[in-house]
Amino acid sequence: MAPPEAEVGAVMVMAPPTPGTPGTPGGPLITGMRVDSMSFDHRKPTPRCKCLPVMGSTWGQHDTCFTDFPSPDVSLTRKLGAEFVGTFILIFTATAGPIVNQKYDGAETLIGNAACAGLAVMIIILSTGHISGAHLNPSLTIAFAALRHFPWAHVPAYIAAQVSASICASFALKGVFHPFMSGGVTIPSVSLGQAFALEFIITFILLFVVTAVATDTRAVGELAGIAVGATVMLNILVAGPSTGGSMNPVRTLGPAVASGNYRSLWVYLVAPTLGAISGAAVYTGVKLNDSVTDPPRPVRSFRR
């Protein structure tokens, strides 16, 4: 609750934050109220998200939501460590679903495979997003850098962490599930043109949603993990039988290296990257500008 108005000339003494205050030890991860302690203005309840930190500007437009909610100072080493672990978890779980499905004669089904990937994305965003931004995908990293949401200087290191994590996870899967590794390889069952189009479209959809929850001050950033995970699940339900529903170059690259099967690999490297850039660019172009009369919410995103 906001403190009462101070009399003119009176000295205002602010009480220290209680353990229940977000950002203090023992405090909640997300709160539904934001109070401007400098002006004591009564603002509408506005949610805060601490899972996906952001900073910077987009196409010359300053994102004012960052001015009163600074990102923690996280070293690049910690970011890369979180990105490696997050990508490892994603590739291991998302690839294990189809492998188990093959090994046990369809026990997982398409819905199970989609759930493995979607739930993995959700929990990784919620657990590591505040550290590295939880990119987990070179296409996302490149798209955000191209649209000035992410520094180009960090792109090679992020991609190296993602690729190495994917290969490590894939060889771990090979050791556990050999000889069923082929079940986790994404290979098109349609023509190359159809596979390219499908991967482009589903990655476009994914980055459209990611850019919304990551960069728009009016999007519900607290639901970023759920929104992105649900999008991944939906896309796999749509494209899984045709292309495997990769949307991510390292989702295909790691299992391809571990199994030695590089069939149509270029489709899964090029189409998701082009789709990601297009999806992010389209949302950036259509999103509403911040209104002076409607204070933006302090949200965080995939940008670190």
Curated annotation (Swiss-Prot):
BP GO annotations: arsenite transport; borate transport; cellular response to boron-containing substance levels; response to arsenic-containing substance; response to boron-containing substance
Keyword Lyase included in the entry's annotation: no
Disruption phenotype: Plants display lower boric acid uptake into roots, lower biomass production, and increased sensitivity of root and shoot development to boron deficiency.
Tissue specificity remark: Expressed in rosette leaves.
Transmembrane segments: 80-100, 106-126, 157-177, 195-215, 219-239, 266-286
Motif NPA 2, residue range(s) on this chain: 248-250
Membrane topology (UniProt): Multi-pass membrane protein
GO molecular function: active borate transmembrane transporter activity; arsenite transmembrane transporter activity; water channel activity
GO CC term (a single one): lateral plasma membrane
Intervals of motif NPA 1: 137-139
PTM sites of type Phosphoserine: S301
Localization in the cell: Cell membrane
Keywords: Cell membrane, Membrane, Phosphoprotein, Repeat, Transmembrane, Transmembrane helix, Transport
Induction of the gene: By boron limitation in the root elongation and the root hair zones.
Pfam families: MIP
Listed SUPFAM superfamilies: Aquaporin-like
Function: Boric acid transporter. Low water transport activity. Plays an important role as plasma membrane boric acid channel for the boron uptake required for plant growth and development under boron limitation.
Family: Belongs to the MIP/aquaporin (TC 1.A.8) family. NIP (TC 1.A.8.12) subfamily.
Domain notes: Aquaporins contain two tandem repeats each containing three membrane-spanning domains and a pore-forming loop with the signature motif Asn-Pro-Ala/Ser/Val (NPA).
Protein name stated in the entry: Probable aquaporin NIP5-1
